[in-house]
Amino acid sequence: LVGPNSIGLVSTATGLDATFLEGRPPEGSLSLMSQSGAFIAAVIGWAAQHDIGFNDVVSLGNEAVLDEVDFLRQWDDDPATDVILAYVEDIDDGQAFIETAQDVTATTPVVVIKSGRTEAGAAAAKSHTGSMAGHDDAYRAAFEQAGVLRADTIQDVFDVGQLLAGQPGLDGDRVAVLTNGGGPGVLTTDAVGDSRLDIATFSDETRADLDELLPAAADITNPLDIIGDADLARFDAALDAVLADEAVDGAVVLSVPTALYEVDALADRIGDRQTEHGTPVVACLMGGEPADRAADTLAEYGIPNHFDPARAVASLEALADYGDIRDREYETPTEFAVDRERAFEILAQADDREVDYLGVEAMELLAAYGIP
């Protein structure tokens, strides 16, 4: 039983549409659950416009029976779900969520956008669902412990979700930047520098190959600027050499539109080279309507296209974060005997006194949680 206070659910694979939404989302490998029906209604049309497909979409409502933990388990066992996305305002059973998410994220990425991060947002969440949103630092720590990737914006949720669904894992932090325009290449390099990622150092063999392939005016270091007169053949040859380098774990490919190549054809070359080498790639094919068409071509290869290089780097960084999550081993947490009744009594007394701090009662509260 889903709900109450839910707009229903959709399963695109089976054709089930038990909602009153205006349109049905396209079929895909993302599964989305949300504690806000309005969030689903807001993003479904936008996602369809951007060719973002879903396997299941579930409005959780007030979670009288089924909650986010149940759907984590459901989608972990579902081969049609590659990535789980979630909008949450609060989580009632934090321990169950953490333990379940640790199991799930070993094979299936989970990306969560958590509202109520600020005092004003928490108050709005309470008025919306009646939920008591906990302190955001506690949620941040819980998500980290659970192996959950946290997104701060709607755009981030789908940027990361699409990349995780379409690209192989990032085995390291070394990134190549390939561009035909100096300015965007520098912006991308700055974004890499602001992230956990590193600018890769090309091997001597790759540098020798690039020296033969590129004009004398081109600098064969990383970021690799193949200069503004690059045609399709130069783009393709340079990308082939870069992705073949074992010192490169991932790549950002940028193109500034010129009359020397068709951007649709470039998108096909990028997709073919990524498939050939198996190295994760994100693209920034800039421009207007032709770039939109190229983005559709890239999507067929599971490669996202971003106008802003910072978004491309951020999604690639999330791919590296998930690689760490997938490979890590969890320690069994220490369990304490908790006297919850006494703990609530201490906090209630402090609330009655209208104070936001504890004096000597803090020791009693720690003792109630078994903390010496």
Question: Can you name each region flagged by the protein language model?
Answer:
Residues 2-372:
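Catalytic-core regions of core metabolic enzymes
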